[in-house]
Amino acid sequence: MKALIILGLVLLSVTVQGKIFERCELARTLKKLGLDGYKGVSLANWVCLAKWESGYNTEATNYNPGDESTDYGIFQINSRYWCNNGKTPGAVDACHISCSALLQNNIADAVACAKRVVSDPQGVRAWVAWRNHCQNKDVSQYVKGCGV
């Protein structure tokens, strides 16, 4: 009986945890969802961005105490401008989406919102991690061997 309880707790923790993509799995998924070359941003740059923003984790969150906003999901999309978490003062919600939708294992909503973000004048430069880790770097390693 004790073993069943422990097994149940282990399984529960696994089901609650977000999906952490493998690099090539993410590259293939992003390509299928139309991000390769979207607004001039290569697939390798998107994978690099996701690596440094979230470690490929769909359930990643990061609270920003300065403006009381939170970054959500695989692309760390911010609640101040892009999604609605019902808590961020003065939020814009430009993607017209609940922030919790950005934490799903199915990343279609996160990709749709990322397309909205990159369509703004700042483009992919909106992501600090991209500027710090991907901009002006050889990012080909992020899709190497993925067959994409």
UniProtKB/Swiss-Prot annotation:
Gene3D superfamilies, per database record: 1.10.530.10
Active site residues of this protein: 53, 71
Pfam families given in the database record: Lys
Statement: the UniProt record of this protein carries the keyword Disulfide bond: yes
This protein's UniProt keywords: Antimicrobial, Bacteriolytic enzyme, Disulfide bond, Glycosidase, Hydrolase, Secreted, Signal
InterPro entries: Glyco_hydro_22 (IPR001916), Glyco_hydro_22_CS (IPR019799), Glyco_hydro_22_lys (IPR000974), Lysozyme-like_dom_sf (IPR023346)
Stretch forming the signal peptide: 1-18
GO annotations of cellular component type: extracellular region
Superkingdom of the source species: Eukaryota
Top EC group: hydrolase
PROSITE patterns cross-referenced by the UniProt entry: GLYCOSYL_HYDROL_F22_1, GLYCOSYL_HYDROL_F22_2
Domain C-type lysozyme: 19-148
Compartments reported by the entry: Secreted
Sample GO molecular function, one term: lysozyme activity
Cystine pairings recorded for this chain: 24-146, 48-134, 83-99, 95-113
SUPFAM superfamilies attached to this UniProt entry: Lysozyme-like
GO BP of this protein: defense response to Gram-negative bacterium; defense response to Gram-positive bacterium; killing of cells of another organism
Assembly behavior: Monomer.
Misc. remarks from the entry: Lysozyme C is capable of both hydrolysis and transglycosylation; it also shows a slight esterase activity. It acts rapidly on both peptide-substituted and unsubstituted peptidoglycan, and slowly on chitin oligosaccharides.
Family: Belongs to the glycosyl hydrolase 22 family.
Record PANTHER family: LYSOZYME C
Physiological role: Lysozymes have primarily a bacteriolytic function; those in tissues and body fluids are associated with the monocyte-macrophage system and enhance the activity of immunoagents.
Protein name in the entry: Lysozyme C
